[in-house]
């Protein structure tokens, strides 16, 4: 490729609405341009990197035995109504009607469509296992698209769907996809972690997310530095921080705490550690034609409620936070002074594992400006229902028993799910098993955010000059910067020969023949992030030398002109092989 025949749309300044590094650099490097909120044009530089990501994904999916197909972006409402997600999905699902008033959606995902394919095409256990995948444009009507390609409304995704005869076979399909994802992200050159995760709205029983580690990540990841354990904070098990409950050492007493509605303020006033206070959270579950059930959840004062874990407890599916009016009706006081002792109406108490092992703790007195100290289970309160209802914190013991947890930020770029029979049952996707009986197909689904990978890679790989691409997904591997290409025959001939030699060696090379000043050329290619640069000048050629500099190198080095192409080609191959 020659730069004079390519489009280079670099900018000196980032748009005012760009908040994070990847968004700023993708715009400045001429990779993307905004069309509407969360919708982008991918310019030639950006598209080249997208195609390289897609190529790696295709190679590894094919290697894992998946079969590529292509499903429509537009899907009929009937399929979503069959699965039940027409009502469940919410406003993120972009719905519209055609001229005949038929309802459709622009697909954010394709479980319904692929299940429709399977129920019509797969009849026997002999046709399974099978795994279909596609690389397709998706649309989710995000309420607040931001961060460029990180949280866009339109995006490119690889989604795959496996169909198996039973759950044991699904585990094998799942493992193949898990391993394929590890290979994909390793080949791309990302620092990543697979983490145990919650299935969310997709459904099913088991899942892992793949996170690129970056300070700008939206997700909190709990991991153990001394083991392989990693999980999304929303899914990580929080072990009790006390091995057993100590015997009571204090008498229960009511304490005046004027104006102290927060655990931190109460602890400071009483001169006790925050860890001895209890945070009370009131939830409600509605009962048709009757009063709601009111729940009091008890957490240590320095801990936070995990709503995902809470929703999985018996009776708490579909819970909501109680209104202030309900709180006053059941407890006789507004939030800030709530506790399990002396409620006006019966409430169901759930204590976090750590709280269940506490002694001599402090709770609200259900009276404004008062708390109760020296509270103990068994003596002052009946034994509670005990459950893991909190988020883990840095320093907590790792669930695998191999050290303490740390917390980092991650950008989710992939997710694998064991769906089970959720969609098969809802949509009647059955097959005939070995005994001649109809059984529901057992499904898995596996997604990778193709365009999001670009943003995540940049968040890990940049400096004050621009992007520093991992070799495998750089728009070009090598750039040739001739000094005076349009003025010097020697420079032009040397540059053209280098270009031909590198291209013949299979290197993705671009020759900057625009005739720009050296400073402009260097700034453009450092911003775009090409990993290797060769500078050809008359002075160097007289000495038989060409200047080489890697994008990550602090200084340039000189290479013999007659072997520069071979030397750089070897550097590229070595980088891709890592």
From Swiss-Prot:
Superkingdom per UniProt: Bacteria
Catalysed reaction equations from the record: tRNA(Pro) + L-proline + ATP = L-prolyl-tRNA(Pro) + AMP + diphosphate
Transmembrane spans: none
GO BP, sorted A to Z: prolyl-tRNA aminoacylation
Role summary: Catalyzes the attachment of proline to tRNA(Pro) in a two-step reaction: proline is first activated by ATP to form Pro-AMP and then transferred to the acceptor end of tRNA(Pro). As ProRS can inadvertently accommodate and process non-cognate amino acids such as alanine and cysteine, to avoid such errors it has two additional distinct editing activities against alanine. One activity is designated as 'pretransfer' editing and involves the tRNA(Pro)-independent hydrolysis of activated Ala-AMP.
Family: Belongs to the class-II aminoacyl-tRNA synthetase family. ProS type 1 subfamily.
Domain free text: Consists of three domains: the N-terminal catalytic domain, the editing domain and the C-terminal anticodon-binding domain.
Protein name as annotated: Proline--tRNA ligase
